[in-house]
Design a protein with these regions (language model features):
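Class I SAM-dependent transferase core
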Residues: 1-36, 41, 75-78, 82, ...
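Conserved S-adenosyl-L-methionine
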Residues: 44, 56-62, 127-129
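Conserved SAM-binding loop of SAM-dependent methyltransferases across substrates and taxa
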Residues: 47-59
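S-adenosyl-L-methionine
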Residues: 66-105
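Short beta->alpha hinge that forms the Motif I/post-I loop of the SAM-binding pocket
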Residues: 67-72, 112-113, 138
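Short SAM/SAH-binding signature in class I
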Residues: 104-112, 119, 132
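C-terminal substrate-binding/active-site "lid" region of AdoMet-derived donor-dependent transferases
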Residues: 123-179
Length: 191
């Protein structure tokens, strides 16, 4: 059972699908505040790195990875097997339609919305008005859309964290810090 977040990026099987980096995963998981029996969605799951860590944290619950790209779905299957994330279910499809038949979520992570953020959030709160949602945004337009959506649906407990991580890279006998793309982590939950 996973006691802390932060599986190293190198441990995941990767392809061309985007992967939430370790530092961002760790903060995003912290903001989700999962419990052992959480029922979680990972929308736009990519490689499944966050899905796997969610499943290991919510080991008595359920995690649903939703991904539209076939090659990424295959990576999620491979990472599920590698990390023995038996409570991780994988749904190939586009949200929000792919979410309609899933069980009621207690938590949802949105890493990719394909332009359907408002519709996804609407469906999540229809299923559970108290769902805790964490959204990762790489563009200012998505941040704006997330905040407009939060206001429209009456979320009072909103938090935005901007994370800019850098990693060292060896340059001969020296080390240089190489910045990762900055990311906005938005947490939504109704009181």
């Amino acid at each position: 059972r996973l006691e802390t977040q932060g599986i190293r990026d190198e441990e995941f099987i990767r392809g061309k699908a985007p992967m939430t980096k370790e530092e961002v995963r760790t903060v995003s998981l912290s903001k989700l505040r999962l419990t052992a029996d959480s029922v979680c969605y990972d929308v736009g799951a990519g490689t499944g790195s966050l899905s796997v860590e969610m499943a290991l944290r919510a080991h008595q619950g359920q995690v649903w990875a939703i991904e539209k790209k076939e090659d990424a779905v295959e990576l999620i299957h491979r990472n599920k097997l590698k990390f023995a994330a038996d409570n991780l279910e994988i749904v190939e499809g586009l949200a929000p339609e792919a979410l309609t038949e899933l069980p009621v979520p207690t938590h949802a992570f949105i890493g990719g919305s394909s332009g359907n953020l408002k519709e996804i959030v609407k469906l999540l709160i229809e299923k559970n008005p108290q769902v805790r949602i964490v959204i990762n945004c790489i563009t200012l337009e998505t941040v704006s859309e997330a905040l407009e959506t939060a206001k429209e649906f009456g979320f009072e407990e909103n938090e935005i964290v901007q994370l800019g991580a850098a990693r060292s890279k060896a340059i001969g006998r020296y080390h240089m810090m190489m910045g990762e793309n900055p990311i906005y982590i938005i947490t939504l939950q109704k009181k």
